[in-house]
A protein has these predicted regions:
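C-terminal nucleotide
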Residues: 6-11, 16-18, 32-337, 386-397, ...
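Catalytic metal-binding acidic patch
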Residues: 1-3
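Short pre-catalytic strand/loop immediately N-terminal to key active-site residues, enriched for Gly-Thr
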Residues: 351-355, 534-536
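Glycine/charged-rich beta-loop-alpha catalytic/anionic-binding loops adjacent to active sites
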Residues: 292-299, 341-353
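Short, charged, amphipathic alpha-helices and their helix-cap/turn boundaries
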Residues: 337-345, 383-384
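Inter-helical turn/loop segments and adjacent helix faces that build the functional surface
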Residues: 374-383, 424
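DPxDG-like acidic metal-binding loop motif
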Residues: 355-377
Length: 543
């Protein structure tokens, strides 16, 4: 086809087709006798003259019978070639002259819509496979893959194969999650494909750390203790936009605030040298202890619910396992001997589990910061925040960056990132007037409901929607990202009423993204206070 020329084949009656070529930029209005009236991008008078035919009078082109009805595909091919590129093709001219012809208006009235829909379904079924196979030049992996998966499952279309390693990482992630979704709809085993997608995401995030391996060195005297403390955080707007993979291809905007409880940072870590070449882990609030004497014991960090998953993964990232270490050692015992001591790490989380205040991520950041000081690694707060994101990938809990940066960076702020695997946020500090002024300070209440959920369960379903380019998920996330800027503006202006209403809007967005956010027990609490509050929300991924 020449550039700018399109072809439409319209079903007419029970067995015939109308051949309808046209120009992409044709206005399809104007008299046939007017030189400015275009057909396939050229004056229709010129088109008719080139083909030795005469078109009648001053009739508008919209009403002109130009489109022949054909009985076979062979006729369609011949007449279309004559109409578009081969004006001297006599057999095409004969078909056009002898056929019954319809105008554009006639086609609108006489098209067989049932056949048209069926025809489009057949084409669509074939096109899905072609789009997937031609992914290098097609938009397949940019489409709403959750919708595409429904079509693949319904029509039993053969799944696209797993993409080889030379393809872009994000495209391979989309590929595995798409395959997983089709299998899930068909009732087949899908978890393996799903886990491959999550594993590739971890690979992309962890690869940045593998390039800069660590050499921990004892940085304290034997009678010294490193003491790390952090507040927790409350997210006010934009939560979820910080979560991979969404933030990797769209960036994220989050407004949150660091808070202490009862005047104290509730998350604390103590590290001191040990006389034995072992790593001793203790948790004050859980009353647990574990002694680690091998790399395999240290690598056992990806069990959700383990009391010491976080310090184990943090020690791994600090270079206490071979894959993250700049030096080679025969064993952990030998490494600790070269280090100069063992380590005793004590954790205290003076806050209920599953509170939604970012406890696990901020505790991880606090542990990483304390280890950095103890081992002379000199990580700044940006590096600690980034390594916390990676640590959570190692734990397979996933999660974004707003929790750790919300706690490690003081006060009230807007955090923003751009797309890409480097998710170090730009920080825009906000005035704390609405939180500290005597007129507004008593208007804030942090209330513990006693209802908990593991963020991993919530994350996995929403992240699955992100991987699949789900229009429902991505649309809400885009609104959340814009809403964070509205919240930033309201706080900047010291507008308490608008700020309160925007907190309420954040809650509505969270419910739209995750219907399980508002169980009956939470709704019962809300029903008692909603008439007296400008806004309310559960913090985090459901509180």
């Amino acid at each position: 086809l020449p550039e700018g020329v399109c072809v439409d084949v319209v079903p007419v009656g029970e067995a015939n087709w109308a051949a309808r070529p046209y120009g992409f930029n044709d206005l399809f209005k104007g008299a046939l006798s007017d030189v400015s009236t275009l057909f396939m991008g050229k004056p229709i008078l010129t088109w008719a003259m080139e083909r030795g035919i005469t078109l009648g009078g001053n009739e508008d082109i919209q009403n002109a019978p130009l489109f022949p009805i054909c009985q076979t595909v062979d006729e369609l091919g011949k007449v279309l070639r004559w109409m578009i590129t081969e004006p001297d093709r006599e057999e095409g001219k004969f078909i056009w002259l002898s056929a019954r012809k319809l105008s554009a208006n006639d086609l609108s009235d006489q098209a067989n819509l049932r056949r048209l829909v069926a025809q489009r379904e057949v084409f669509r079924k074939k096109d899905w496979s072609l789009l997937a196979a031609n992914h290098e030049k097609s938009v397949f992996y940019q489409l709403d893959l959750s919708d595409a998966a429904e079509s693949f499952a319904k029509d039993k279309i053969v799944l696209p194969k797993a993409l080889p390693e030379d393809n872009p990482l994000m495209k391979r992630i989309h590929n595995h999650m798409f395959r997983s979704q089709v299998m899930k709809i068909l009732g087949e085993a899908y978890k393996e494909e799903e886990q491959k997608a999550f594993a590739l995401l971890r690979e992309g995030l962890v690869s940045s750390v593998l390039g800069s391996k660590q050499q921990p060195c004892l940085n304290v005297y034997r009678d010294q203790i490193v003491w790390g403390r952090s507040p927790v955080r409350i997210d006010l707007a934009g939560g979820w936009t910080d979560t991979p993979p969404y933030c990797l291809y769209a960036g994220g905007n989050v407004v949150n605030v660091a808070i202490e409880l009862n005047g104290q940072p509730p998350l604390q870590v103590y590290i001191k040298p040990s006389d034995t070449h072992k790593i001793i882990l203790r948790s004050i609030d859980l009353g647990a202890m574990e002694v680690i004497s091998s790399w395999d014991e240290l690598r056992d960090y990806n069990k959700v619910g383990s009391p010491f998953s976080i310090p184990k993964a943090a020690l791994a990232l600090a270079g206490f396992v071979p894959e993250f270490s700049a030096e080679a050692y025969a064993s952990l015992d030998v490494q600790l001997e070269a280090f100069g001591s063992g380590l005793e790490i004590t954790l205290l989380a003076a806050i209920p589990a599953g509170s939604g205040l970012g406890t696990s991520s901020i505790l991880a950041a606090t542990v990483l910061g304390a280890i950095s000081d103890f081992c002379g690694l000199a990580w700044d707060k940006n590096e600690i925040g980034n390594r916390t994101l990676i640590l959570e990938q190692l734990l397979t809990t996933g999660g974004g960056w707003q929790d750790q940066y919300g706690g490690v960076l003081h006060g009230l702020k807007l955090l923003q990132t751009n797309e890409g695997f480097n998710q170090n946020p730009l920080v825009r500090w906000l005035p704390e007037y609405l939180f500290t002024d005597p007129e507004y300070r008593p208007c804030h209440l942090l209330y513990y409901t006693g209802i908990t959920r593991t963020a991993k369960d919530i994350l996995s379903e929403i992240v699955r929607g992100m991987f699949l380019n789900s229009e429902a998920h991505l649309g809400i996330l885009s609104e959340m990202k814009a809403h964070a800027l509205d919240m930033y503006e309201a706080i900047q202006c010291g507008d308490f009423v608008t700020y309160g209403k925007w907190v309420g809007k954040t809650w509505e967005q969270n419910k739209a993204l995750d219907s399980g956010t508002n169980p009956a027990a939470v709704e019962a609490i809300i029903s008692k206070i909603q008439a007296y509050a400008l806004g309310y929300k559960l913090p985090g991924a459901g509180g």
